[in-house]
Swiss-Prot record:
Residues 96-136 are annotated as: Disordered. Binds together with bS18 to 16S ribosomal RNA. Coiled coil: none annotated. GO terms for biological process: translation. One of its GO terms (molecular function) is structural constituent of ribosome. PANTHER family: MITOCHONDRIAL 28S RIBOSOMAL PROTEIN S6 (PTHR21011), SMALL RIBOSOMAL SUBUNIT PROTEIN BS6M (PTHR21011:SF1). It holds the Pfam family Ribosomal_S6. This is Small ribosomal subunit protein bS6. The keyword DNA-binding does not apply. The keyword Ribonucleoprotein applies. Belongs to the bacterial ribosomal protein bS6 family. The lineage of its organism: Bacteria, Pseudomonadati, Pseudomonadota, Gammaproteobacteria, Methylococcales. It comes from Methylococcus capsulatus (strain ATCC 33009 / NCIMB 11132 / Bath).
Amino acid sequence: MRHYEIVFMVHPDQSGQVPAMIERYRSIIEGAAGRIHRLEDWGRRQLAYPIAKLHKAHYVLMNIECDQATLEELESGFRFNDAVLRSLTIRRDEAVTEPSALARSGSDAEADRAPADEGSVEAAGAEPGSEAEAEA
């Protein structure tokens, strides 16, 4: 079996149906003795250019291992599902299991934001006191 990386974009109005779509694709892959090595739901993101007059889409990334027939079934499912705006399938030489750069940067940004917010609150609390001391 070969390894593939698949990214598909879902219409933003259909974001609520993404978990069901993921589960449907998961059952197709695992039903044919395939494996999902990595599954990331990137959520709603801004598009680089409008697609069908839309400026946002819901992104999903999957790294899978499956045979050609299963891949054709998945791609057929993407093509005939009106909620899927675009899909891209890339053949990989080996399984990719570590988080993508987008997922890493998202978790790093959240971790960086939390301490920065605490520091700004402390600084904001110190400023009024220092102004009062300077005026006295």
